[in-house]
C-alpha cells in the first residue's frame, strides 16, 4: 500500500523497476502499440495471416470488440497507474537525495504523458486518472484537456530528467537506459506536431 511504501531507496528503485516492467509489457508484440501509426500499410498484417484484429486496423474498420485495441487500452492505464503511484508518493521517501526523487518522479511524469498521448491519438476523448485507483466511471475529458495534461507532464520531465545518466541502472557505458532530457524533447516535438495537425 502507498501509505507504507517508499520507506527507503530500495522502495523507490523498485517502484521504477515496476513502472518500466509495465512499460515493457505494453510495448511487447502481443499488444497493438502501433495502432495509430501502422494502419493502412502492409507491415502489420496480410490476407493469409491469422491476425484479424490487426487486419481491421489496416482496413480502417475496427470493431468495438477488437481484442488488440482493448489490450492497448488496458496496458496504457496500467502504465498510468504505476506512474501515478510514484508521482503521488515518492516525494516522502526518507534518506534519499531530492535529486534522486525528482528524477524518479520526472520519469513517471514522462511515461504518464506518453501513455496519454497514445490514448488521445487513438481514441480522442479519454478519462484522466491522477490517482493510483482506476475509476471506471470517470468522465471522458476533451482532447484539449488531455493534451494540457500531456504537456504539463512533459515539461516537468524536461526540467528534471538529466541529459545523461552516469550511474546504473539508468545509464550504462555512456548510454541512457532511462528517459533522458533528449527523449522528452523529442516526444514533446512530436506532440506539438500532432496538435498542429502535422503528424
Regions found by a protein language model. Give the residues of each.
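Bacterial Sec-dependent N-terminal signal peptides
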Residues: 1-10, 150, 189
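Conserved, well-structured interaction surfaces
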Residues: 9, 13, 17-27, 49-123, ...
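Beta-strand acidic-aromatic groove motif in beta-rich domains, primarily in extracellular
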Residues: 28-34
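Outer-membrane beta-barrel translocator domains and adjoining extracellular loop/strand segments
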Residues: 130-133
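Amphipathic alpha-helical protein-interaction segments enriched in hydrophobic
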Residues: 176-187
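Polar, glycine-rich mid-to-C-terminal structural blocks
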Residues: 190, 196-199
